């Protein structure tokens, strides 16, 4: 497969969602304590009530802004109280509503410094051409907070820890933070980009990305196995079976999102898939 074939395949898959995003809406819900799901069936968006304003992790597709605003209202929150949006990486399907929040409410926007620099260097980096119905005037947002590898950032009573995981983009963020419900504190974790089309040779060469990226990703994925995670969050629902877990919760009760083996399972699977790409593409580590 080449880049153009992959682009056409993706646009075909996404065309129905872009025409009728309301068909992909789901009711927002609490995951644990101050952590909520406000995304849709195509992309994950998480809301954290920090006690001193709200934080969003990603803001979804540009054609589904209304679904996000509606979900925030339905939970009893106000979109104007979103202080910060943390972006897992620099692809268009994760910053769709961010400019709206910044312009209307003064929300600060955060992303890794690495991806911010790539977006500035090459506007195509954000894959806006992959959006079947993106308005021509739609541009990547400006970012006020640039995150470094290993950095901590505190908002209200929540401290977010960031690890850089180059691969899906050079500046993908893994995000870890504690959430409390009653006397119980759990660790939430999210790996902000697990799709591997972006580490195939055709994609790397299309955007002038280093061929070392698959090896960089493999090294960091292995290192992340040391992180303890009680609640594995996805940045697309398939990453952690968001929709299946919610359906199970509605039928059986309990909290299927709390499962400390999910994180290790994700990383084991991802490690194997990265090695498959390296072998398939005959990449050689320098």
Question: Language-model segments: which ranges?
Answer:
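C-terminal regulatory/interaction regions
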Residues: 4, 258-286
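Divalent metal-coordination and catalytic microenvironments
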Residues: 34, 48, 58, 68, ...
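Conserved beta-strand hairpin/beta-sheet module of binuclear metal-dependent hydrolase folds
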Residues: 21-75, 79, 174-196
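Metallo-beta-lactamase
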Residues: 11-16, 24-25, 30-32, 54, 61-63, 81, 143, 152-154, ...
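Active-site-proximal beta-strand/loop segments in catalytic clefts of secreted hydrolases
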Residues: 40-41, 59-60, 88-90, 112-114, ...
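N-terminal non-globular leader segments, chiefly Sec-dependent signal peptides
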Residues: 1-13
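Active-site HxH/HxHxD metal-binding segment of metal-dependent hydrolases
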Residues: 35, 63-66, 73-152, 251-252, ...
């Amino acid at each position: 497969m080449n880049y153009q074939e992959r682009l056409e395949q993706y646009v075909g898959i996404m065309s129905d969602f872009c025409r009728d995003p309301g068909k992909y809406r789901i009711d927002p819900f609490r995951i644990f304590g101050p952590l909520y799901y406000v995304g849709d069936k195509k992309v994950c968006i998480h809301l954290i009530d920090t006690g001193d304003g709200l934080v969003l992790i990603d803001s979804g597709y540009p054609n589904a802004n209304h679904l996000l605003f509606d979900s925030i209202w339905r939970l009893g929150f106000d979109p104007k109280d979103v202080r910060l949006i943390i972006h897992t990486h620099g692809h268009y399907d994760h910053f769709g509503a961010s400019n709206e929040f910044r312009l209307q409410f003064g929300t600060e926007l955060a992303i890794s410094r690495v991806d911010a620099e790539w977006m500035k260097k090459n506007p195509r980096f954000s894959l806006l051409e992959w959006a079947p119905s993106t308005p021509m005037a739609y541009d990547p947002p400006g970012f006020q907070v640039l995150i470094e590898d290993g950095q901590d950032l505190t908002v209200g009573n929540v401290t977010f820890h960031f690890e850089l995981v180059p691969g899906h983009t050079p500046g993908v963020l893994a995000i870890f933070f504690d959430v409390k419900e009653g006397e119980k504190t759990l660790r939430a974790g999210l790996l902000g980009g697990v799709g591997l089309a972006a580490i195939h040779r055709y994609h790397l060469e299309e955007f002038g990305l280093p061929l070392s990226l698959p090896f960089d990703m493999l090294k960091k994925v292995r290192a992340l196995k040391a992180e303890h995670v009680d609640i594995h969050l996805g940045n697309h629902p398939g990453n952690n079976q968001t929709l299946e877990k919610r359906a199970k919760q509605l039928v059986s009760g309990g909290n299927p999102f709390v499962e400390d083996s999910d994180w290790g399972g994700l990383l084991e699977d991802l490690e194997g898939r990265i090695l498959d790409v390296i072998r398939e593409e005959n990449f050689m580590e320098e």
